[in-house]
């Protein structure tokens, strides 16, 4: 059991990528960390619980396991997610639903499991990991962009719902990061000929940007430090160029925004 001053934090998707780096950074900050993922890749000082975030019963059971060991849950960081790419026309409904089941509804399931306890304890911090793709709508990564836009909109609204109970909600919009996310992406170039080779060119550009992206360990520390804030903001964007891009996309008319993103990825 964690001490009175030790923060108890749940991290989803903690077996790899941003989730793993965040769990490691939280541990270094002195937190008691519980990592929810399907794979158990041991990490010193971090407790793994086998959880598929698309299984609501499993999520609830895992949260109850944490509560059996601890007297509190200070924060939850929802990192679990994956990406698909391809033309909307050639993406099956099953693939599209799977993208939302993990990226959006998985986040919702974890938050639903912890919110009653946080509300009763009168405090807590929910951190949902989104993407600048939520505002820079990337062609041939349409369902990923849409799932992250859903996470961002959900976070803004939830923040107002739970604010009276001392619960903070933060959404972190990330840019390109060099992790295994690129290799794990479910890619499809079906219809590339019909689309004039644009699908393969767009995916190639995405992969290049990701492989030359930000250091995941630095991003893990960035997210872990947000948990330490007494008055966290509702939204953070990591990286100067992504802050600029996010602001630009929010200020520009839709047509101008579309032309810029289309030149980069279309």
Residue spans for each PLM region:
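N-terminal Rossmann NAD(P)H-binding glycine-rich loop of SDR-like oxidoreductase domains
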Residues: 15, 23
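Rossmann-fold cofactor-recognition segment
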Residues: 44-57
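Conserved NAD(P)H cofactor-binding loop of Rossmann-fold oxidoreductase domains
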Residues: 79-84
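Substrate-binding pocket helix/loop in short-chain dehydrogenase/reductase
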Residues: 87-88, 95-97
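Active-site helix of classical SDR
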Residues: 111, 147-150
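Residue(s) in the substrate-gating loop at a strand-loop-helix junction
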Residues: 131
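SDR active-site lid
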Residues: 164-233
């Amino acid at each position: 059991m964690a001490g009175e001053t030790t923060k108890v934090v749940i991290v989803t998707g903690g077996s790899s990528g941003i989730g793993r780096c965040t769990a490691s950074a939280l541990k270094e900050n002195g937190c008691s960390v519980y990592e929810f993922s399907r794979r158990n890749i041991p990490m010193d000082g971090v407790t793994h619980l086998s959880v598929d975030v698309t299984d609501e019963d499993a999520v609830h059971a895992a949260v109850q396991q944490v509560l059996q060991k601890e007297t509190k849950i200070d924060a939850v960081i929802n990192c679990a997610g994956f990406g698909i790419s391809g033309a909307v026309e050639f993406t099956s409904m099953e693939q599209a639903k799977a993208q939302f089941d993990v990226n959006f509804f998985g986040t919702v399931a974890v938050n639903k499991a912890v919110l009653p306890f946080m509300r009763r304890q009168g405090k807590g911090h929910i951190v949902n990991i989104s993407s600048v793709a939520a505002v820079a709508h990337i062609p041939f990564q349409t369902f990923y962009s849409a799932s992250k836009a859903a996470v961002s909109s959900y976070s803004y609204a939830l923040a107002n719902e739970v604010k009276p109970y001392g619960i903070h909600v933060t959404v972190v919009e990330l840019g390109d990061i060099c992790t295994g996310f690129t290799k794990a992406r479910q890619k499809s170039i079906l219809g590339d000929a019909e689309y004039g080779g644009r699908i393969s060119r767009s995916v190639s550009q995405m992969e290049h940007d990701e492989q030359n992206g930000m250091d995941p360990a630095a991003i893990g520390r960035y997210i872990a430090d947000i948990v330490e804030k007494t008055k966290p903001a509702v939204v953070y964007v990591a990286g100067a160029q992504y802050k600029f891009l996010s602001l630009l996309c929010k200020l520009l008319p839709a047509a101008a925004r579309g032309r810029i993103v289309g030149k980069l990825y279309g």
